[in-house]
């Protein structure tokens, strides 16, 4: 076997490469498509290029490109909203305010850096000091009348930073507007300046009061976090060069208290060791829509500069699902635009209890000129039309009538058709899981739901809505094709089960050896004797997280290390010195929009293109496995890593992850690692929290996205999560790793742990990871090696298990490293 070889990753050239330019433009395109227009009163947008703009708010000049931790990208540079507007010729009249904020920000960053470096001296893991002290955007000085002179329109940018290791806080300046933000916005309102409010945050910020109590906030845009060229992307939308077409992927509540089980999330109830998912299947819009709780902005919502008409054109049924046809026409007169057609279904209501509607499929049009139309075909998988029965341990397509709704958000739907299933059909008989929860789920009042169900049935009858007979057929399982390794002595295979031990301990992926800043590597212990080459991994999911630059000693050819902190924040926390007689290598990766922003495009073809671009950079920097995409459910808006994830909906999450996977893995030698499997829905005490989830909620909500991604795109790897699930660490869970992933879904790739899951005293047990089907412990340490060796010698870790797990690992290594 020929393997990939190189001397040093990156290039000595500091100049921007053609690849950087090309992928930067793709990042900008994805950013444009992910911007969501939430309000546009008096059609204030798009702006006239001659409009004099007063630009304010923390994110105006310091726009947040993405979240912190492993989801960050150390790219070359970023274009802020201020820069984007200036490059487009917009006259900014608030330069003094912006310059003053620049100095405030610089001082806040300096003080924050000093605090991190000081606290890092007294902790075993420097990343803990970083995670416990997330940087908060400082407040600027108050906006005054002097700052608004000549301003014809105000743009106010609310920015938030969140990241790995800590959940967002329910305080002013985080989930709520800060006191200064409120005062500034109210001041602009009192000045009667038409205002555009920009939300530059990885998740919702509560806006209800400020929107209801002011008169001059004419427009609101949720831009999420748009990567390195977000400022240009937003300018293109504000000026009408691009018509906004993004849609929300999570519900924005009027009040935090409106979210299900809101007061019991994470740290709020004081029980960080146990998280009870009492809401069951009623997450996000499933709760709001089912029980009539009005949100501020609903799931799937997003406005445009033009008007679109959606007409249902018919439906076809087959044993494996349904195909809906819908025609979209741009009925506007001025702007071209795109539309997302969303199809929802209502399942038969019975004693099992179901949500009122669920997203069943979607498609996005091409760019339609005024008067232009397009016919879309939207496929609905049979399992999307089923529910999971805990009593029968099966997915069941239930006898009865199903409503099919078509529109462009959960709040804007038309009853289009009715499906009839003559007899109940078991689609998939599942394995009985060993670990179940003992929690009692919330019991919600379903009286209104029954009335609404009756109402749509009457409407279908009175309006003679088309009725289609659907005969679902059972799923055929894909058998796992894993083969054991039978040639190499079993004891020599043991190092495969933990990463290439580098002596670096971090919950952040920074244990790479051959590519500076890479997350880690599989073992090199079998290379000399058996030619087994180690795989190199890099964090994601907004691009590759590598060290931006590094030095190599010219005489010894050794790389100067910078430590875990040095790999963060584009090297801002680096303390290393510049060395004499050393060459500097550069690794400039592209910072794409965060996962949420990509999902807000609702454009699978575009996400696949982003995946191809990521793979191109993997090839350039010798990365075999990308530790992405992340597709945990956005269960609560306070989760610190929601920005990495796609949606509160499992279908949308899984479909986006599948598109990204297809893109990356279309390039030979490039693989993804879908994560975090499963229920990694909070960051506080993420390594010790026990997620208590009913099997139905687990399968319908929290595992469904993984199932879609595995079956549609065949990712080569899965990463298990830190948390316990119903009493067992995910990396030690036979239910997750073997019973579900391998035996039910036919997953034949490798499952690896998240970083240092075995390090805590009550963490995952190394040898039990292997027996559960979690093949590799990352990044690996001496204690892992000793625990596995002893378990093998004692017979707790059998030779059969060793050979089967090794077979999966060696197959992956061969697939990704052979040329």
Segments (PLM) and residue ranges:
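Glycoside hydrolase catalytic-domain context in secreted enzymes
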Residues: 1-388, 394-410, 427-819
């Amino acid at each position: 076997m020929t393997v990939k070889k190189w001397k040093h990753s990156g290039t000595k050239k500091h100049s921007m490469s053609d690849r950087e330019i090309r992928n930067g433009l793709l990042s900008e395109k994805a950013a444009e498509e992910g911007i969501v227009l939430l309000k546009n009163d008096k059609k204030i947008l798009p702006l006239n290029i001659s409009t004099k703009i007063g630009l304010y708010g923390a994110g105006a000049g310091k726009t947040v490109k993405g979240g912190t931790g492993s989801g960050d990208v150390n790219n070359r540079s970023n274009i802020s909203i201020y820069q984007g507007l200036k490059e487009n010729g917009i006259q900014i009249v608030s330069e003094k305010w912006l310059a003053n904020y620049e100095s405030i920000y610089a001082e806040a960053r300096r003080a924050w850096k000093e605090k991190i470096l000081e606290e890092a001296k007294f902790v075993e893991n420097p990343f803990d000091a970083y995670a416990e002290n997330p940087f908060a955007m400082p407040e600027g000085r108050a906006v005054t009348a002097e700052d608004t002179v000549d301003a014809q329109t105000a743009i106010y940018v609310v920015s938030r930073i969140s990241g790995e290791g800590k959940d967002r806080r329910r305080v002013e300046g985080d989930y709520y507007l800060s006191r200064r933000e409120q005062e500034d916005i109210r001041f602009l309102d009192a000045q009667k300046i038409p205002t555009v409010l920009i939300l530059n945050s990885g998740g919702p910020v509560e806006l209800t009061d400020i929107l209801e109590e002011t008169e001059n906030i004419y427009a609101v845009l949720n831009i999420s976090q748009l990567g390195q060229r977000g400022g240009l992307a937003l300018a293109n939308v504000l000026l009408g060069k691009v018509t906004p077409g993004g849609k929300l992927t999570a519900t924005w509540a009027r009040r935090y208290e409106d979210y299900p089980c809101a007061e019991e999330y994470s740290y709020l109830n004081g029980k960080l060791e146990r998280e009870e998912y009492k809401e069951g299947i009623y997450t996000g819009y499933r709760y709001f829509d089912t029980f009539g709780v009005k949100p501020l902005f609903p799931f799937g919502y997003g406005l445009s500069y033009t008007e679109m008409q959606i007409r249902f054109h018919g439906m076809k049924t087959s044993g494996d699902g349904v195909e809906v046809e819908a025609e979209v026409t741009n009925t506007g007169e001025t702007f071209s635009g795109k539309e997302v057609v969303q199809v929802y279904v209502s399942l038969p209501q019975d004693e099992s209890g179901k949500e009122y509607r669920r997203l069943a499929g979607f498609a996005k049009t091409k760019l339609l000129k005024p008067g232009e139309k397009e016919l879309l075909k939207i496929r609905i998988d049979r399992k999307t039309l089923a529910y999971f029965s805990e009593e029968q341990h099966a997915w069941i397509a239930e006898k009865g009538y199903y409503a099919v709704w078509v529109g462009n958000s959960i709040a804007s739907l038309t009853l289009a058709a009715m499906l009839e299933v003559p007899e109940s059909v078991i689609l998939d008989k599942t394995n009985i899981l060993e670990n179940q929860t003992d929690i009692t789920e919330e019991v919600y009042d379903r009286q209104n739901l029954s009335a609404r169900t009756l109402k749509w049935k009457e409407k279908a009858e009175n309006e003679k809505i088309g009725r289609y007979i659907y005969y679902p057929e059972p799923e055929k399982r894909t058998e796992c094709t894993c083969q054991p390794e039978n040639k190499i002595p079993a004891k020599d295979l043991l190092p495969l089960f933990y990463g290439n031990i580098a002596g670096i301990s971090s919950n952040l992926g920074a244990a790479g050896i051959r590519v500076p800043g890479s997350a880690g590597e599989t073992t090199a212990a079998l290379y000399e004797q058996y030619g087994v080459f180690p795989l190199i991994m890099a964090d994601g999911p907004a691009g590759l997280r590598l060290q931006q630059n590094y030095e190599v000693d010219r005489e010894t050819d050794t790389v100067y290390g910078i430590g875990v902190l040095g790999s963060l924040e584009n090297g801002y926390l680096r303390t290393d010195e510049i060395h004499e007689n050393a060459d500097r290598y550069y690794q400039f990766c592209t910072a794409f929009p965060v996962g949420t922003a990509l999902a807000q495009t609702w454009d699978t073809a575009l996400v696949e293109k982003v995946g191809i671009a990521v793979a191109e950079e993997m090839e350039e920097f010798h990365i075999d496995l990308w530790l992405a995409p992340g597709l945990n459910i956005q269960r609560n808006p306070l989760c610190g890593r929601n920005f990495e994830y796609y949606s509160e909906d499992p279908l949308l999450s899984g479909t986006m992850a599948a598109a990204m996977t297809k893109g990356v893995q279309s390039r030979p030698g490039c693989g993804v690692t879908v994560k975090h499997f499963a229920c990694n829905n909070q960051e506080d005490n993420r390594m010790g929290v026990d997620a208590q989830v009913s099997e139905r909620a687990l399968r319908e909500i929290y595992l469904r996205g993984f199932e879609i991604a595995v079956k549609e795109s065949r990712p080569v790897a899965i990463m298990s999560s830190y948390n316990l699930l119903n009493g067992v660490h995910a990396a030690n869970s036979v239910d997750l790793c073997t019973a579900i992933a391998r035996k039910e879904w036919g997953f034949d790739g490798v499952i690896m742990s998240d970083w240092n899951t075995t390090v805590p005293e009550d963490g995952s047990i190394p040898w039990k990871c292997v027996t559960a089907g979690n093949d590799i412990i990352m990044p690996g340490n001496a204690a892992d090696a000793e625990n596995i060796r002893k378990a093998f010698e004692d017979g707790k870790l059998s030779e059969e298990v060793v050979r089967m797990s090794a077979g999966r690992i060696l197959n992956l290594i061969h697939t990704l490293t052979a040329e």
